[in-house]
């Protein structure tokens, strides 16, 4: 019973996070993306639920692909127009699901190998490694047909000041920074639940955010 409840909660967190990410990718700014990424970190131990996060984020943010219908203007028969547009949209969601799921799987694998001792240094290394892997993946994706998948550009137009950091380390670096912000928010919530260190975590994070701006 408890395992089923935990699984349902995990799915709910992944679904809500994916919806928030989808809104964040269309609206821009940290207001949506920070809690979305915090929820992604909270479910990252489950590649399947992480895939749900990725799928919902892209299906919501790229729903404009359905507006390509009718595709008769590029020679697609009217009867096939909507199925083709829907297939493109679903493919985008599936691609995002696979990529985010692979990222989560890699994180769980690394957590059980390179960082299995559980010390502070190991956890910090794991955090920086996973955030950097995401950022590097966005750099590589930017040079591929999947260039549209990524959170690096989601800071615009909502947070131009933080987006300005791109002049030093690019969109991949912005993605890494956002992953770190999401992790901080997640850890602050965990500290609040434990009743230990929440205020300190919140204060340090806000100071760093202020400096980044």
Features from the language model and the residues they span:
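Membrane-embedded alpha-helical bundles of multi-pass enzymes
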Residues: 2-213
């Amino acid at each position: 019973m408890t395992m089923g409840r935990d699984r349902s909660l995990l799915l709910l967190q992944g679904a809500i996070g994916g919806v928030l990410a989808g809104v964040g990718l269309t609206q821009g700014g940290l207001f949506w993306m920070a809690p979305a990424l915090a929820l992604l970190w909270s479910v990252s131990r489950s590649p399947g639920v992480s895939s749900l996060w990725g799928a919902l984020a892209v299906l919501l943010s790229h729903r404009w692909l359905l507006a390509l219908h009718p595709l008769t203007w590029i020679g697609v028969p009217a009867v096939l127009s909507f199925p083709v547009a829907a297939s493109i949209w679903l493919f985008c969601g599936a691609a995002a699901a696979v990529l985010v799921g692979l990222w989560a799987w890699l994180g769980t694998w690394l957590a059980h190998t390179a960082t299995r001792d559980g010390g502070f240094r190991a956890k910090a290394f794991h955090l920086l490694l996973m955030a950097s892997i995401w950022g590097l993946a966005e750099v590589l994706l930017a040079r591929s047909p999947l260039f549209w998948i990524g959170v690096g550009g989601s800071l615009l137009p909502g947070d131009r000041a933080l987006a300005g950091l791109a002049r030093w380390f690019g969109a991949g670096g912005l993605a890494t920074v956002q992953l770190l912000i999401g992790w901080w928010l997640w850890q602050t919530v965990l500290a609040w639940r434990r009743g230990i260190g929440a205020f300190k975590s919140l204060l340090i994070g806000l100071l760093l955010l202020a400096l980044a701006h």
